[in-house]
Amino acid sequence: MGRGRVQLKRIENKINRQVTFSKRRSGLLKKAHEISVLCDAEVGLIVFSTKGKLFEYANDSCMERLLERYERYSFAERQLVPTDHTSPGSWTLEHAKLKARLEVLQRNQKHYVGEDLESLNMKELQNLEHQLDSALKHIRSRKNQLMHESISVLQKQDRALQEQNNQLSKKVKEREKEVAQQNQWDQQNHEINSSTFVLPQQLDSPHLGEAYQNTNVVDNGEVEGGNSSQQQGAANNTVMPQWMLRHLNG
């Protein structure tokens, strides 16, 4: 006799239910992989266990891209076929979709920081490693770009500061030269102002009349040829300047 058809209903035994879930889950993931390879189809599979543990499969290991494509397709379908978004059923479905997407994003975020890796198989771990390596390459490339830009900015600032320093040094030297010249001029002016020039004053004035008499000096130092009154008068005779003589003669 052939094997009878199994009736589809909830397995009451907890252990049998877990064993069946594990077997059917593996078979389902295998079938999803086979159809993606054989038919070159994009397949995304999401399974939650009774304990809320997530199991998924994506042929290109990018469930986010598949979900985004699904959202775009669903949005386009909703645009073509108007639906009543005010009904409780539509809001419940939309909430379930957003919740599932949020859980996927949270799970992937944990995977990126090295958490909750027990549920991943070898291929999924390799794909995650490849994604992290690619992300690190982009991060290093961006970091190197920022470093080169910072170095370029610092070099420009250094050249500008050197040019400014050269200009300031040139101005200081010019100022020192001007101060030295000014000090030299001030010293020369001070020497000129402090010097006195004595001009000899020689007045060639004629005598008014016979001011003096010839005297003979004897051996004992006495003066002959005149009395004391004549000598006193000779001493009082004044040498007259030329301009006074002109007034007197006029």
UniProtKB/Swiss-Prot annotation:
Tissue expression summary: Abundant in vegetative organs.
Gene Ontology CC entries for this record: nucleus
Domain K-box: 88-178
Subcellular localization: Nucleus
PROSITE patterns xref list: K_BOX, MADS_BOX_1, MADS_BOX_2
Sequence ranges assigned to domain MADS-box in this UniProt record: 3-57
Top-level taxon of origin: Eukaryota
Database matches in SUPFAM superfamilies: SRF-like
Biological processes annotated in GO: positive regulation of transcription by RNA polymerase II; regulation of transcription by RNA polymerase II
Molecular-function annotations in GO: DNA-binding transcription factor activity, RNA polymerase II-specific; protein dimerization activity; RNA polymerase II cis-regulatory region sequence-specific DNA binding
Keywords, comma-separated and alphabetical: DNA-binding, Nucleus, Transcription, Transcription regulation
Family annotation (InterPro entries): MADS-box/MEF2_TF (IPR050142), MEF2-like_N (IPR033896), TF_Kbox (IPR002487), TF_MADSbox (IPR002100), TF_MADSbox_sf (IPR036879)
Main location: nucleus
Role of this protein: Probable transcription factor.
Protein name, UniProt field: Agamous-like MADS-box protein AGL8 homolog
